[in-house]
């Protein structure tokens, strides 16, 4: 089980939606956080109740924005959290392989 965070700034919603749909196909993904550092509130598409949109109303920076989602994962006792950029391409088998590797190499 893992959560995923994607930091956004004036996002290309088509790109974000494509990535999010691919992540949602993976049974290991519990929640996806869209953390938006854009200067104005955007109307995000609704894809799933597994996606949480967080609008910061300012550009906190890449790391600080991901930390918001990571804190939620810690609070929810999710053992793993994946930090990704919105322009990557993934498949569910990649997430499964990554999670298996992490579980086998926790040192």
Regions inferred by a protein language model and the residue ranges of each:
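Conserved donor NDP-sugar-binding/catalytic core segment of glycosyltransferases
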Residues: 93-107
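Short beta-strand-to-loop acidic/aromatic patch adjacent to the donor-nucleotide binding site
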Residues: 77-89
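Hydrophobic targeting segments
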Residues: 1-6, 22-23, 31-35
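Active-site acidic Asp-centered loop
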Residues: 37, 56, 84-86
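Glycine-rich, basic loop-to-helix element that forms the pyrophosphate-binding segment
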Residues: 57-75
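A conserved acidic beta->alpha catalytic loop
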Residues: 34-44, 58
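Short, high-confidence coil segments that cap the C-terminus of an alpha-helix
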Residues: 29, 78, 105-107
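Short, well-formed alpha-helical segments that are part of the catalytic scaffolds
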Residues: 11-25
